[in-house]
C-alpha cells in the first residue's frame, strides 16, 4: 500500500513538473497599442482594429508562438507626446502619430539609449493636405495674406506648426515679428475662435475641417498650398520588433484589412468613428471617402521619407530636440513588406500608386459612369446609408433643391476644388458660374476671382449657387 502511495506521489510530482514546465514555456506576450482615436486619419492603425477585433485574426499561434497567450492592451491619447512618454517608459509597444511627434518619439528613444522605428504610414498627403488654418466664421480675413500682425494659435511642435512656419516663410514674413504665434491645443482653440480671442488657428487632422463643419470657423488655408508632404503612421519599440517580428507583421496585416474595409464601405466606417469619438461622420468621410483629402497609403513613398527629414530638421530649428536621427534606419519597411506579401498584395506596385481613393460610381440622375472628377459633387442625405454621386455641381444643386422641397435634408454636400482637386464642404466653398452654366468650386476666393475673370463669370456663395442651378434647370 505504502509502495503504491509512493508511486502515485511520484507520478503526481512528475505531472506537476510537466505542468510547471509547460507554464514556463507558455509565454504571455503583451501587445500594448497606443491610439489617437480623435485623430481620425489614424483610424486604420487603432480604432478600427480594436472595434472590429481584427488583430486576433492575425496574431500567430504556431511555431514558437504555439503555446503563447496574448495580453492585448489599448490606450487612447489625444496627442503623440504622452504616448511617446509611455513608449519610452516601456508601457506601450506600438504608437500611432504624425511625422513631427513621430520624429520626437525617435529622438526620445535615442536619448534613452534605445530605438523606435516607423513601420507604416496610415494616411497622408504628398502635398500637405490635412493641416490647415481657420478663422472665425464671421471674420473678414479671406487668405493667409490677411494675417500679418495677427494672433495665430497652433499646437507647438506639431505637423501643423511646421506647416504654419512654411506658410509664413512663403509670405516673406518673419514668424517672430510679423505675426504673433501662440500655443493652443485644438480644444482650447475652438473656444478661442468662438470668443474671437484669436484671429486664426492652425491645426492638424481633423480640426481644420471639423471646426468649419460645426459652423464656427472657416478654412482660409489648406496645407496642400505648402506642397510639403505630411502623414500619420505607426511606430514600434525596435527591441520589441526584433523579439516578436511575427507580432509586428500581424498588427500590420490588421492595418491592411482595416484599410480595405474602409475602402469598401466608407460611409459605414465613418459612422463607426463618429460613434466612438464624436467626430462627425461627415468629417470622417471627407478624409476617408473616395477622392478624400488624404490617401490611406500605407507605403513609404519618398515624399513621406522626406517629410520625416523635414520634421527632424524643423524640430531642431525650434529647439525641441538636439538629436540627429538617421531616417534610413528610423523608417523600416521590412515588416510592412512582409505583411503585404502575406496578404497577397504587391508592395512595390502600391509604392508607385499615387492615386486618391477612387470614386467608382454612376451619376445618380443619368446612370452613366462618372469619369471626369473635376466637378463631382456628392450629397449625403439624412436617413440614407450611402452618398449620392453627381457628375456636376449644377446637377447636384438643382437636385438638392428638389429634394429639400420634398422634405429631404442633406447631412452634407461635398464638392471638388477646381484649382487643387481638394474635396471641400460645399457650404464653405466659393463658386463661379460660367457663360455655359457650369458651376465650379474653389476653397479660396482669390482663386475664384481669377477664374471668374477668365470665363467672364460671377463669384457666388453656396446659397446663390444652389439658386442659380435651380433656375437654370427651370429655364430649359
Where are these predicted regions, by residue range?
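Short, glycine-/small- and polar/acidic-enriched structural segments
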Residues: 27-174, 180-183, 199, 228
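Pocket-lining segment of extracytoplasmic ligand-binding domains
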Residues: 110, 176, 182, 187-276, ...
Amino acid at each position: 500500500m505504502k509502495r503504491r502511495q509512493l508511486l502515485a506521489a511520484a507520478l503526481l510530482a512528475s505531472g506537476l513538473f510537466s505542468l510547471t514546465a509547460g507554464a514556463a514555456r507558455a509565454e504571455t506576450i503583451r501587445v500594448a497599442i497606443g491610439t489617437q482615436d480623435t485623430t481620425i486619419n489614424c483610424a486604420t492603425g487603432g480604432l478600427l482594429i480594436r472595434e472590429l477585433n481584427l488583430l486576433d485574426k492575425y496574431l500567430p499561434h504556431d511555431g514558437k508562438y504555439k503555446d503563447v497567450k496574448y495580453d492585448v492592451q489599448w490606450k487612447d491619447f489625444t496627442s503623440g507626446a504622452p504616448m511617446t512618454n509611455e513608449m519610452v517608459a516601456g508601457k506601450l509597444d506600438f504608437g500611432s502619430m504624425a511625422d513631427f511627434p513621430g520624429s520626437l518619439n525617435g529622438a526620445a528613444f535615442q536619448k534613452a539609449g534605445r530605438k523606435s522605428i516607423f513601420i507604416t504610414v496610415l494616411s497622408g498627403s504628398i502635398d500637405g493636405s490635412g493641416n490647415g488654418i481657420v478663422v472665425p466664421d464671421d471674420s473678414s480675413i479671406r487668405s493667409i495674406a490677411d494675417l500679418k500682425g495677427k494672433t495665430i494659435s497652433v499646437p507647438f511642435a506639431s505637423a501643423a506648426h511646421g506647416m504654419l512656419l512654411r506658410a509664413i516663410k512663403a509670405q516673406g514674413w518673419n514668424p517672430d515679428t510679423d505675426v504673433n504665434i501662440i500655443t493652443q491645443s485644438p480644444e482650447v482653440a475652438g473656444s478661442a475662435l468662438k470668443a474671437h480671442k484669436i484671429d486664426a488657428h492652425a491645426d492638424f487632422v481633423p480640426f481644420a475641417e471639423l471646426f468649419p463643419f460645426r459652423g464656427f470657423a472657416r478654412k482660409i488655408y489648406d496645407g496642400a498650398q505648402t506642397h510639403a508632404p505630411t502623414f500619420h503612421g505607426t511606430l514600434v519599440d525596435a527591441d520589441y520588433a526584433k523579439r516578436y517580428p511575427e507580432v509586428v507583421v500581424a498588427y500590420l496585416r490588421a492595418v491592411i484589412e482595416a484599410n480595405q474595409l474602409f475602402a469598401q464601405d466608407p460611409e459605414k466606417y465613418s459612422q463607426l468613428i463618429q460613434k466612438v469619438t464624436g467626430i462627425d461622420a461627415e468629417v470622417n468621410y471627407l478624409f476617408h471617402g473616395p477622392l478624400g483629402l488624404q490617401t490611406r497609403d500605407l507605403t513609404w513613398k519618398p515624399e513621406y521619407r522626406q517629410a520625416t527629414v523635414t520634421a527632424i530638421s524643423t524640430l531642431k530649428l525650434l529647439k525641441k530636440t538636439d538629436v540627429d536621427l538617421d531616417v534610413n534606419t528610423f523608417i523600416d519597411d521590412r515588416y510592412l513588406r512582409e505583411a503585404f506579401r502575406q496578404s497577397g498584395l504587391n508592395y512595390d506596385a502600391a509604392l508607385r500608386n499615387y492615386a486618391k481613393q477612387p470614386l467608382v460610381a454612376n451619376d445618380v440622375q443619368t446612370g452613366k459612369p462618372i469619369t471626369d472628377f473635376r466637378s463631382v459633387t456628392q450629397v449625403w442625405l439624412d436617413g440614407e446609408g450611402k452618398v449620392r454621386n453627381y457628375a456636376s455641381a449644377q446637377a447636384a444643386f438643382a437636385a438638392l433643391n428638389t429634394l429639400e422641397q420634398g422634405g429631404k435634408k442633406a447631412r452634407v454636400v461635398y464638392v471638388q476644388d477646381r484649382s487643387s482637386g481638394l474635396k471641400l464642404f460645399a457650404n464653405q466653398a466659393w463658386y463661379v458660374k460660367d457663360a455655359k452654366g457650369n458651376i465650379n468650386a474653389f476653397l479660396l476666393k482669390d482663386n475664384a476671382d481669377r477664374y471668374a475673370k477668365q470665363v467672364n463669370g460671377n463669384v457666388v456663395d453656396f446659397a446663390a449657387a444652389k439658386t442659380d442651378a435651380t433656375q437654370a434647370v427651370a429655364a430649359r
